[in-house]
Amino acid sequence: MFACDELLLNASTIDATGLQLSNQAIVIKKGRIEWCGSEDQLPAHFQESAKSRKDCHGQLITPGLIDCHTHLVYAGHRAAEFRLKLQGVSYADIAKSGGGILSTVQMTRDASEEELIDQSLPRLLALKNEGVTTVEIKSGYGLDLQNELKMLKVARQLGEMAGVRVKTTFLGAHAVGPEFKGNSQAYVDFLCNEMLPAAKNMDLVDTVDVFCESIAFSIRQAEQIFQAAKDLNLPIKCHAEQLSNMGASSLAARYGALSCDHLEFLDENGALNMVKANTVAVLLPGAFYFLKEKQKPPVDLLRQVGVGMAIATDSNPGSSPTTSLLLMMSMACQFFSMSIPEVLSAVTYQASRALGMEKDIGSIEAGKIADLVLWSIKDSAALCYYFAYPLPHQTMVAGEWVS
């Protein structure tokens, strides 16, 4: 009888705050971390009776990385719009000519489930290739009942196909469905009364998100959707304070939001309300870069008041066409002046909090699922120093090496 399934020795690791630890051992049993800590404190029975053991030679082991904000499922792309933007055409003019988000909506509606899988699976596999073991995927390019459900179904299937843990987020409130043009309130009513309950009844939704902004949904409409989610016992998230300060972060915090995302225009009141609600700030440097934004999220304020900060790709065709969480880590250091430990925590522990999964994943602690990444480096700073490099040496999901 073996005391454990896998014993990892002579490793460097990081703690939940992102600080590096040396001479560490990790014990894996039945897909979870049985024990972890300094190797000189390793209980003898694990050392004597391990089914398998690996000498890591001082190389870094992190928790499996977590991309906690993506719009990964969609059809087509918007490269033609990128060309127009470079020629000086405004986003408003692009939208008036049929471009923008509604062009992605049309392409996504036109695609079958199989076509969506064919186009989206490579994006998920690209994240997996960087050591990402958990991904949040939003709907929001269907904007009607049939196609929002289709997107959520595809997201679930992608997780099974890729061997990646997928959490789904219903983002029907991404934009107003074209059938409801000029009547956003009727769309919100339909979303709350028909779309969201259907997604819940089919077990397709884990969380609910709203894009609360002057160009999207009002505070009153966001609250209506949050209340509908609460009535269905679904946790909420919010695209908040990206383009202006509407007070969306305070509203979301009042409903116990797991996270508020973007936050370039967050003020102190919103940050304090987020602290009280234990709400995570999800920062999205890819969108900041691609949109050439000038206003940075208030990282110093978030630090001062104690809001946990996560980082994600925001992978989407309109404002962050990337599948590299490693690149986002480097960008967060350079653009947002985040420290290396902050960034490492942001894509592990804080990202798990943003998904409400911190009891199971996000840090190397006894009792948690054994999602781990072994890197061919010894200094954790290298993960932020390089651009989208190095790739993992090996990745473990639930106690099994998958690469």
Curated annotation (Swiss-Prot):
Pathway entry: Amino-acid degradation; L-histidine degradation into L-glutamate; N-formimidoyl-L-glutamate from L-histidine: step 3/3
EC code(s) of this entry: 3.5.2.7
Cross-referenced Pfam families: Amidohydro_1
Main location: cytoplasm
Keywords: Cytoplasm, Histidine metabolism, Hydrolase, Iron, Metal-binding, Zinc
Cleaved signal peptide residues: none
Sequence similarity: Belongs to the metallo-dependent hydrolases superfamily. HutI family.
Name of protein: Imidazolonepropionase
